[in-house]
UniProtKB/Swiss-Prot annotation:
GO MF annotation terms: 4-alpha-hydroxytetrahydrobiopterin dehydratase activity
Catalytic activity: (4aS,6R)-4a-hydroxy-L-erythro-5,6,7,8-tetrahydrobiopterin = (6R)-L-erythro-6,7-dihydrobiopterin + H2O
Record family assignment: Belongs to the pterin-4-alpha-carbinolamine dehydratase family.
Superkingdom of the organism of origin: Bacteria
Keywords in alphabetical order: Lyase
Protein name according to UniProt: Putative pterin-4-alpha-carbinolamine dehydratase
GO biological process, one term: tetrahydrobiopterin biosynthetic process
InterPro entries, per the entry: PCD_sf (IPR036428), Pterin_deHydtase (IPR001533)
EC annotation from Swiss-Prot or TrEMBL: 4.2.1.96
């Protein structure tokens, strides 16, 4: 099991993640895409990465907007696993722009 990070550790790590915030035991972000197809394409790529990492986002999609929250349920908070997936998500989104 991964160790839960302290709020100070989380805030420090978030400095490397533009547009991500910490609230309610999770890290959160949102993205806006050109259209639904682009949003869904990114979601599909994230889904494959999440499956490979065996760590899955809590997310929502309305048309061209995607909201993502990450936390580690077993640790009841944020762990390194969340930041690893967040980095992969950032890389996926950047590669589509």
């Amino acid at each position: 099991m991964m160790n839960k990070l302290s709020e100070e550790e989380i805030q420090d790590k978030l400095k490397k993640f533009d547009g991500w915030t910490y609230a309610k035991k999770s890290i959160h972000t949102s993205f806006q895409f050109e259209n639904f197809k682009e949003a869904f394409t990114v979601m599909t790529r994230i889904a494959f990465e999440a499956e490979a990492q065996q760590h899955h986002p809590n997310w929502g999609n309305v048309f061209n907007e995607l909201e993502i929250s990450l936390s580690t349920h077993d640790a009841d908070g944020v762990t390194e696993k969340d930041f690893k997936l967040a980095r992969a998500i950032e890389d996926i989104v950047e590669s589509t722009n």
